[in-house]
């Protein structure tokens, strides 16, 4: 797998459960033109995002089942690739990003973690709908859409 894209979990949630950001998420994934990397951390965060949508009554159980089926279909089709993320090796990268950029960009810890994970996994693109996270990804040398 040569070209790969790492998507922030909020973008993934909008990709699989329709909301106001779904068109932008679809456009970002289409523009990336590469398989999306998916770590166990992102899977956990996505599961939680789905459950929060249920709690907030923004989605139904049927919506969640459909979203999960769509994700499984994308994994089977090779559009999403499950990858291992060695967290212990991501934290030093995240700490470096924090020291260099947080005071300038104003990024939150989990946003930094995702950028660090993308760097560790050698993703060729970083997909996010968050402007601060996008600025951090660019400052870290990642291509964004």
Regions found by a protein language model. Give the residues of each.
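Active-site-proximal, substrate-binding regions of enzyme catalytic domains
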Residues: 43-98
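Active-site neighborhoods of divalent-metal-dependent phosphate/nucleic-acid chemistry enzymes
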Residues: 80-135
